[in-house]
């Protein structure tokens, strides 16, 4: 099995991992696992995944170029179209992030 480049755990024990290399055609696969480690959903992205975070029943996927927001099983993933985020930390239906402008707070 591939070594994950990012991991996060959400409510109810859902585990998220990012595996793969964005330089390869297959890209990076983010997988959601239930508490028994059975895969319950996947999302493939073409960019390097910088970090994974959970907030309530959602997962935030920070890539080199954007922020993706998905449901717990990764069946619905949308692009927040926010670039320039270097680091982030979710908190109470929003998140703090570090950008070129400094530390900011944004709502989900």
Region locations from a protein language model:
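C-terminal structural cap/anchor segments
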Residues: 13-48
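Blade-level signature of beta-propeller repeat domains, shared across WD40, Kelch, NHL, RCC1
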Residues: 77, 81-108
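Short loop/turn segments that connect beta-strands within the blades of beta-propeller domains
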Residues: 11, 26, 55-56, 63-65, ...
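Repeated scaffold domains used in trafficking and secretory/extracellular systems
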Residues: 1-12, 44-57, 82-94
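Structural motif
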Residues: 24-31, 66-71, 102-108
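A short beta-strand motif characteristic of beta-propeller blades
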Residues: 1, 37-44, 74-81
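Residue position within the beta-strands of beta-propeller blades
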Residues: 16-18, 61, 97
């Amino acid at each position: 099995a591939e070594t994950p480049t990012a991991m996060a755990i959400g409510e109810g024990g859902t585990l998220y991992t990012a595996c793969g290399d964005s330089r390869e055609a297959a890209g990076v696969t983010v997988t959601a696992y239930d508490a028994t480690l059975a895969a319950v959903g996947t999302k493939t992205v073409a960019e390097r995944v910088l970090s994974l975070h959970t907030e309530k029943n959602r997962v935030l996927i920070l890539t080199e170029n954007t922020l993706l927001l998905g449901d717990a099983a990764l069946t619905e993933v949308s692009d927040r179209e926010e670039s320039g985020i270097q680091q982030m930390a979710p908190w109470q239906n929003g998140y703090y992030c570090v950008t070129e402008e400094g530390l900011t707070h944004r709502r989900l």
